[in-house]
Amino acid sequence: MNTQQLFREITQEQIKSDVPAFRPGDTVRVHVKVVEGTRERIQLFEGVVIKRHGGGISETFTVRKISYGVGVERAFPLHSPRVAQIEVVRYGKVRRAKLYYLRNLRGKAARIKEIRR
């Protein structure tokens, strides 16, 4: 067994199977496990997916939201044990894979059309 096969076998065990299908433009609610001292709690982060990057075990996605008038972006590893759950709230219709242009838009201009699924 060579190293590529070994690497593939190890990463296959770590990949989550309960990840919903979502794309850039979709609004998601990410349940993140946060450890504070000895306590562990779930923190929600809801926003628009502006990009997905990579593949396999190292795949990440970035979510953007506006909090108190300030844009906040957070990148999450898709298969991380810290990500407890991902819920798709809305499906958006966009024609780009990377939605960096949303960083420059404010208010109603930053809206994304919704697809009914």
Swiss-Prot record:
Q: Native species of this protein? A: Exiguobacterium sibiricum (strain DSM 17290 / CCUG 55495 / CIP 109462 / JCM 13490 / 255-15)
Q: Which HAMAP family match?
A: Ribosomal_bL19 (MF_00402)
Query: Which terms in the GO cellular component ontology are assigned?
Result: cytosolic large ribosomal subunit
Report which gene this protein is encoded by: rplS
Q: Which GO terms describe its biological process?
A: translation
Q: Which family does it belong to?
A: Belongs to the bacterial ribosomal protein bL19 family.
| Gene Ontology MF terms in the entry | structural constituent of ribosome
Record InterPro entries: Ribosomal_bL19 (IPR001857), Ribosomal_bL19_CS (IPR018257), Ribosomal_bL19_sf (IPR038657), Translation_prot_SH3-like_sf (IPR008991)
| Role description | This protein is located at the 30S-50S ribosomal subunit interface and may play a role in the structure and function of the aminoacyl-tRNA binding site.
Q: What is this protein called?
A: Large ribosomal subunit protein bL19
Sorted alphabetically, which keywords does the UniProt record give? Ribonucleoprotein, Ribosomal protein
